Amino acid sequence: MLKQEWLAQKKTSMPEYDVMLPITEFLDKTNNETFRQLLSQATALILEAQAVFFFGIGTSGALAQYGSRYLANAGIFSLSINDPFTPVGMRETVVADTLLVVLSVSGETTEMLAQVEQYQAGKGKVLAITNSTHSTLARLADVVIPYYMPEEKNGSLNNTTQIPVVYILELLAHRVACAQ
């Protein structure tokens, strides 16, 4: 079999990934009072905080950096935590008036949960943007904004679309900017 024939056969035999279906479903779910209330609660947490810290691991870490910068552009003091092993040493005097925004598809990553628990020990607030309300992260957070995307894996790597996360981050930043 020639390489071109093999590639053509492979192309037709593999199911095509269409991100539009889950994204359309997500956007439909955002057009309701429950989602608007979650956004209002999250916006209030951001506006009440003296500082906002974003945290995620892997792709979620890259989006945490983006979210931090985007929120800073809206006039909020915001930083991202890039190292999941950062010894937080959270004391109430340091984090009591701050917010940790945690991005995680699974909501179950051990290192991420350890950071959240340390942060909460210092009386900081936690906003989780995660794929499900049934994760450990969701149970720990003060406010959870779920996005319910079908999980896509490549071995141990997570390829779940992050379009809803970007949508939520940008929407929150715009709401915060308008509220100031």
Language-model region placement:
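A ubiquitous structural signal for well-ordered alpha-helices
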Residues: I23-F26, T30, A42-L45, G67, ...
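Glycine-rich phosphate/diphosphate-binding loops that line cofactor/substrate pockets in enzymes
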Residues: Q37-A49
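Glycine-rich phosphate-binding loops that contact phosphosugars or nucleotide phosphates
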Residues: L47-Q180
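HTH-adjacent hinge/linker in prokaryotic transcriptional regulators
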Residues: M1-L38
